[in-house]
């Protein structure tokens, strides 16, 4: 295995690990505990399954922590293609990671309130709004990521195009959720297809790695 392919696989595996932690907090936990527009039922579920909810908080923190290493691995893989764009990806991660950690603190705050029922939806909605706001920054991560993949020649160009579309999709989701929340679910339904680009790149990196001969051909 070449050093380039090894770097790609490390990045892919870390990407998968971070995504798994994210799915636990953003998909699995809400499906088990959160009841839309029902603060009483949501509060009861959280109190009845406090360990599960706390596990979701830990998963969210781990997702954010592992993402730092994902970004560093991607930087190592792609800096030779375009260092300014690769640095921009690192800068965005440095900016966005503290936001995730602060957002996790909002979840912890639920357990500190005497009137949990009155505050639970407030903090969960605040968590969601911060997630939406942070998605505005993802376009500044995924568009450079997509451009680097497209130019690399050792990764499929279609993945580069797809990742650029992922960045645009995150931006549209963020703007819709913040300004037109009634349409958020509709936009999310269509955006899911585009966001599968992240699944595609992480699986390609982890399974296929990178083709170093393509890099050699492009620099000759």
Regions picked out by a protein language model, each given a short descriptive name:
Residues 1-220:
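Hydrophobic, aromatic-enriched alpha-helical segments typical of multi-pass transmembrane helices
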């Amino acid at each position: 295995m070449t050093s380039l392919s090894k770097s790609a696989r490390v990045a892919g595996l870390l990407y998968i690990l971070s995504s798994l932690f994210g799915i636990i907090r953003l998909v699995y936990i809400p499906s088990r505990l959160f009841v839309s527009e029902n603060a009483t039922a949501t509060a009861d579920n959280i109190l009845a399954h406090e360990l599960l909810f706390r596990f979701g908080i830990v998963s969210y923190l781990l997702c954010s922590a592992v993402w730092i290493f994902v970004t560093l691995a991607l930087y190592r893989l792609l800096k030779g293609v375009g260092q300014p764009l690769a640095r921009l990806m690192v800068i965005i991660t440095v900016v966005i990671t503290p936001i995730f950690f602060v957002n996790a603190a909002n979840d912890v705050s639920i357990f500190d309130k005497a009137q949990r029922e009155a505050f639970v939806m407030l903090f969960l909605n605040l968590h969601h709004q911060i997630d939406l706001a942070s998605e505005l920054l993802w376009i500044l991560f995924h568009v450079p990521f997509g451009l680097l993949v497209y130019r690399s020649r050792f990764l499929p160009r279609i993945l580069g195009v797809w990742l650029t579309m992922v960045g645009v999709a995150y931006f549209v989701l963020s703007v819709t959720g913040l300004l037109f929340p009634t349409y958020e679910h509709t936009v999310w339904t269509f955006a899911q297809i585009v966001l599968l680009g992240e699944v595609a790149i992480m699986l390609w990196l982890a399974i296929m790695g990178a083709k170093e001969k393509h890099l050699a051909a492009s620099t000759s």
